[in-house]
């Protein structure tokens, strides 16, 4: 740009920046974020989850509140701006493990086509600062942060590192109020996040509890998880199962259906029918006193306040699968501010 007047050169640079953001290959896609061994950030394109509202088993009022905050702002963006209302928002889903926070998040991500959706789980949460910078370039955007409590007190990436939770709050502050940017957080330990969020109000606008499923929800979950299974259950079979599974999680009920299928296959290698007897045997096994650890792993009887901070992160598997497939992994190295 040698020889150009300063103002003209600045306009040209601004236009190049605009085109770079507008034509960015990541724009409008669902992206799984991970860290590579060299400290860079890997972005993997993923197929959006094909979930519908009927696939989300929550009380109608709870799901309405979640949709209104996440999707309603997207539907009424122009009207909100015209009325002087901000678009940037934070939504926290909290509750015991296994109740459907991740499933609900996947549903929302699938509904927000046209948004750049960046999903951070596990140690990729350490790069929240840099990922937020990318999201601001690719608005409208969603940053989904799964199980924030697991790394809330860890140090972020970069020489001037700070606890990840404070980096997250700074990132939320850094986005302008008119930015159509949704921060979607999930946690099993709301008690760990609440003091910091309360000290800096306005970052999370809505916190929604995803509680243990009640009796009607448990019935819907059994139907949902058994939709591809040849269930041959009487009304009495279903009612007894609902009664005996009081206090269990969605994860527990999903495993119950799987084990019922295994019980049927044990009787006959050709799967023709899963009966009440199969369901009862599977439930007897899951509720057996020797299966206490199994129930804990399925979120049953777990007090979130008793969960370790960070311990599960280092012992557990890698990032969760957010869609049917991921492909085209590319790498982007962010500056020290965010990793």
Residue positions per predicted region:
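Short, glycine/charged-rich beta-strand-loop motifs at protein surfaces that mediate ligand recognition
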Residues: 2-3, 209-210, 242-243
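C-terminal alpha-helical "lid" subdomain
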Residues: 200, 215-339
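Generic structural signal for secondary-structure transition and capping sites
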Residues: 21, 75-78, 173, 177, ...
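Long, hydrophobic, amphipathic alpha-helical segments used as structural scaffolds
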Residues: 24-27, 81, 268
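Walker A/P-loop NTP-binding motif of AAA+ ATPase domains
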Residues: 53-239, 339
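Loop/helix-junction capping segments adjacent to catalytic residues or to phosphate/diphosphate-binding pockets
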Residues: 6, 10, 191, 216, ...
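AAA+ P-loop ATPase mechanoenzymes
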Residues: 1-75, 87-88, 93, 108, ...
């Amino acid at each position: 740009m040698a020889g150009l007047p300063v103002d003209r050169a600045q306009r040209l640079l601004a236009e190049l920046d605009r085109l770079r953001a507008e034509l960015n290959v990541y724009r409008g896609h669902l992206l799984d974020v991970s860290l590579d061994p060299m400290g860079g950030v890997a972005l993997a394109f993923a197929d959006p989850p094909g979930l519908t509202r009927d696939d989300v088993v929550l009380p109608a009022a709870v799901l309405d509140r979640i949709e209104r905050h996440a999707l309603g702002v997207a539907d009424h963006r122009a009207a909100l701006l015209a009325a002087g209302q901000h678009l940037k928002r934070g939504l926290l889903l909290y509750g015991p493990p296994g109740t459907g926070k991740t499933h609900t998040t996947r549903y929302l991500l699938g509904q927000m086509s046209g948004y750049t959706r960046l999903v951070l789980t596990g140690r990729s949460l350490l790069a929240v600062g840099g990922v937020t910078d990318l999201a601001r370039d690719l608005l409208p955007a969603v940053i989904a942060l799964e199980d924030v409590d697991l790394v809330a007190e860890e140090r972020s990436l970069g020489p001037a590192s700070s606890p990840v939770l404070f980096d997250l709050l700074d990132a939320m502050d850094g986005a302008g109020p008119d930015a159509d940017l949704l921060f979607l957080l999930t946690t099993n330990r709301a008690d760990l996040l609440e003091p910091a969020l309360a000290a800096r109000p306005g970052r999370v606008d809505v916190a929604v509890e995803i509680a243990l499923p009640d009796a009607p929800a448990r019935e819907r979950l059994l139907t949902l998880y058994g939709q591809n299974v040849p269930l041959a259950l009487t009304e009495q079979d279903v009612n007894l199962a609902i009664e005996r599974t009081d206090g269990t999680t969605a994860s527990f009920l999903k495993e119950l259906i799987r084990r019922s299928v295994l019980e049927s296959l044990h009787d006959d290698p050709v799967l023709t029918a899963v009966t009440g007897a199969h369901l009862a045997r599977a439930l007897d096994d899951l509720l057996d006193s020797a299966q206490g650890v199994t129930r804990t792993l399925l979120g049953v009887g777990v007090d979130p306040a008793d969960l370790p901070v960070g311990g599960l992160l280092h012992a557990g598997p890698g990032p969760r699968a957010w869609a049917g497939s991921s492909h085209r992994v590319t790498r982007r190295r962010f500056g020290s501010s965010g990793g």
